[in-house]
Amino acid sequence: MATAAEQWVLVEMVQALYEAPAYHLILEGILILWIIRLLFSKTYKLQERSDLTVKEKEELIEEWQPEPLVPPISKDHPALNYNIVSGPPSHNIVVNGKKCVNFASFNFLGLLDNPRVKAAALASLKKYGVGTCGPRGFYGTFDVHLDLEDRLAKFMKTEEAIIYSYGFATIASAIPAYSKRGDIVFVDRAACFAIQKGLQASRSDIKLFKHNDMTDLERLLKEQEMEDQKNPRKARVTRRFIVAEGLYMNTGTICPLPELVKLKYKYKARIFLEESLSFGVLGEHGRGVTEHFGISIDDIDLISANMENSLASIGGFCCGRSFVIDHQRLSGQGYCFSASLPPLLAAAAMEALNIMEENPGIFSVLKEKCKRIHKALQGISGLKVVGESLSPAFHLQLKDSTGSREKDVKLLQEIVNHCMDRSIALTQARYLEKEEKCLPPPSIRVVVTVEQTDEELERAAHTIKEVAQAVLL
């Protein structure tokens, strides 16, 4: 029975072969021959080449110039001329054995050496040990992490918060968690380096607008709107983001948030706000630029900030709606693939948050001190103040550049060194010059804290004026 069936199938195959069109048979024949060729042919060809003579080898060796193992570095490079700090960089700092008033460290609320913060960290150290030895998604989640996230969400009046173990990685992870290839991000040209790295990792289409220029931003949004009208199918799947800083690290200026929110709703974009400098600084209760302008937190899609400037700790956090934050727990690279924040640092941040809530007057004190030194530094010979009067971190730039960045840096460093000799600790703003998208001009960064007395602020301003006049004139 089986033999008869097999014969019938064979007859059908032969009949189908006769009935098939000629081009079909030719195509199948070519494919069969090509498969046979691929199976039996070599995957490479041996190319004939002649060996070099001894003389030719010697000539090549003579001509070869090896690259230096280490690139040439100037003797003035900061890496070769470093300062040694002894003790915590709090109100007073010991640099190279000399005690100075600290105008260089980001310790806005003066909590870095606070006894309560240190006691909370020590108690956590005794309870949990030093590290967690794992990322949050595995065995690196401790109850203190969940408590801190809950406290931050309540403080910022958002649905949920997420903490990262490294401040720089917070916004650098949050941006690529949402913005992907094909999406469009409108970003200020003065954006900090962490934002730049996040944009680079996202592989999105980046459109830069002039610093705090809402007219230029609207121009770019209109151009994109016109492009979307040409291809509505693509526009439906293209997301648009606006990325800004509350207080800009590179300029000390505040973002025009009310105008940004208007443009967001007009052109259907999402706002990501980086508040590392404005959190714990702006607003009646230190909630940042949204509280400063009276903008509803719901108008901002994502807020990011580090805990290294005001909370006297390490790491960072993002806050917003629950569905926005939950997405980061699966897509935030710095959250998924990094060991979680050491519990002692989470406990320190929580205690700092307690102090902020118990003493809201600290923010008005900081604001007054910022205004005081900002006013005192006006009219310096050869230098100009760059930044808002309410910013605790602002810049002193040369009014007239020498035309050489290297020479400008040397002049400013000379001012810093002379101020250090007179017990005022300052620092230049440093950048990875080859990596920066829009490299800011050289500057001296001045940082104000609540611990600095009025007398120290006046003395610092007077010292900077005298030194600048001696160096630049």
PLM feature spans:
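Active-site phosphate-binding strand-loop segment of PLP-dependent enzymes
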Residues: N107, K207, H211-L273
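Substrate-binding/gating loop at the entrance of the active-site cleft, primarily
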Residues: Y166, V187-R203
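PLP-dependent enzyme catalytic core of the Aspartate aminotransferase-like
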Residues: A2-Q7, M13-H24, E28, L33, ...
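Conserved PLP-anchoring active-site segment centered on the Schiff-base-forming lysine
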Residues: A174-F193
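Conserved PLP-binding catalytic core of the aspartate aminotransferase-like
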Residues: S74-D76, N81-I84, L111, I362-H374, ...
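Conserved N-terminal alpha-helix of the aminotransferase class I/II PLP-enzyme fold
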Residues: I36, A119-G167
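Active-site C-terminal subdomain of aminotransferase-like
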Residues: Y267-R270, L277, L282-L390, L396-T402
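N-terminal "arm"/small-domain region of PLP-dependent enzymes with the aminotransferase-like
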Residues: A4-A5, V9-V130, A269
